[in-house]
UniProtKB/Swiss-Prot annotation:
Peptide chain release factor 1 directs the termination of translation in response to the peptide chain termination codons UAG and UAA. It comes from Maricaulis maris (strain MCS10). This is Peptide chain release factor 1. GO terms for cellular component: cytoplasm. SUPFAM superfamilies: Release factor (SSF75620). SMART domains: PCRF. Residues 284-304 have a biased composition (Basic and acidic residues). Belongs to the prokaryotic/mitochondrial release factor family. Methylated by PrmC. Methylation increases the termination efficiency of RF1. It comes from the Bacteria.
Length: 357
């Protein structure tokens, strides 16, 4: 797909405008806003300039090939075909950069992991996933903060929520939402039989200017004692907070030691969940006419299987199978899966744009 000249000129012009305004800006908020846009536009403008120059050079070389000087024409011919061979790669890279952006891709995110079918083993697997994403976040240079956790009786988590902050968190992790399935022999299994368990992962964007008004009149707040693994009460005061959003039925529980902190945390998670619900509804509306989507986008869709006996991880949406289970679950090898999903999404969206063109 060829990037149109008008679109390239538009990108370069906008970058020049932002750069000029950044040099003259005095307001701190405006500087922050312009700096962010400048950082986003710079690689696109550089690629656009490189492509523009390559196209112009190709036209010049084509003229030189028609010239009277045979030696110069031959040199021009060699350069022309070498550049012509490189041009599709530049065009493709530029087309990817010009794809419409998901406005939430640059946002921070909350990750919620819930043990599904499989009892204790599902909770242990939820704990494995938590460790995998925490390590991945560390490798990406993101910050990770545990927000709330309900521990499993034999390790892992029944449910756990963490906040991840950094550059492009949601854009990289958004395809992790869905049902993750594990096949392995649990530590508690004496017969050596393979069990299948599952955990659900939800990645929820947290834009800085989250556009959600939470009417506390719609929220029922209950306080109770925080409980640890096995259900035992870990303190003697009613510090745990459960918030129920009555219109949607969404429930959030936070059970750290401070009730005040739990209230603030629960509100934050509730807002993220409501925003995510709004976003999912909008996506579902577009899904009917939209091509180029990775999987169904449904949170109940089984997206990936981790098969321990075979050392295999399979992502069912893109037919990807890797025999690198230990490396992936450790977090170190997860980026290969993430990058494959992003590349597949970009290819599908490019194909959809070409179909519409």
């Amino acid at each position: 797909m060829h990037a149109p000249e008008a679109r390239l000129a538009q990108v370069i012009d906008r970058f020049d405008q932002v750069e000029a305004r950044l040099g003259a800006a005095g307001d701190a908020d405006e500087i922050v806003k312009l700096s962010k846009e400048h950082a986003e536009l710079k690689p696109v403008a550089e690629k656009a300039n490189a492509l523009k120059s390559a196209r112009a050079e190709l036209a010049e070389l084509a003229e030189m090939m028609e010239g009277d000087d045979a030696e110069m024409a031959e040199m021009a011919r060699e350069e022309f075909y070498a550049l012509k061979e490189r041009l599709p790669e530049l065009e493709h890279a530029m087309s990817l950069m010009l794809l419409p952006k998901d406005k939430d891709d640059s946002a921070n995110a909350m990750i919620e992991i819930r043990a599904g079918t499989g009892g204790d083993e599902a909770a242990i697997f939820a704990g494995n996933l938590y460790g995998m994403y925490q390590r991945y976040a560390q490798l990406q240079g993101w910050s990770w903060e545990l927000v709330s956790a309900s521990e499993g009786e034999h390790g892992g988590y029944k449910e756990v929520v963490a906040a991840i902050s950094g550059n492009g968190v949601f854009g990289r992790l958004k395809f992790e939402s869905g049902v993750h399935r594990v096949q392995r022999v649990p530590a508690t299994e004496s017969q050596g039989r393979i069990h299948t368990s599952a955990a659900t992962v939800a990645i929820m964007p947290q834009p800085e200017d989250i556009d959600i008004e939470l009417d506390m009149g719609d929220v029922r707040v209950d306080t109770m004692r925080a409980s640890g693994a096995g259900g035992q009460h870990v303190n003697k005061t009613d510090s745990a907070v459960r918030m129920t959003h009555i219109p949607t039925g969404l429930v959030v529980v936070c059970q750290e030691k401070s009730q005040h902190q739990n209230r603030a945390r629960a509100q934050e998670i509730l807002k993220a969940k409501l925003y995510d619900m709004q976003r999912e509804a909008a996506n579902a509306e577009r899904a009917a006419e939209r091509k180029g989507q990775i999987g169904s986008g449904d949170r109940s869709e089984r997206i990936r299987t981790y098969n321990y006996p075979q050392g295999r991880v399979s992502d069912h949406r893109i037919n990807l199978t890797l025999y690198k289970l230990d490396d992936i679950v450790a977090g170190d090898g997860l980026d290969e899966v993430v990058a494959a999903l992003i590349a597949e999404d970009q290819a599908a969206r490019l194909a959809a744009l070409e179909d519409d063109a």
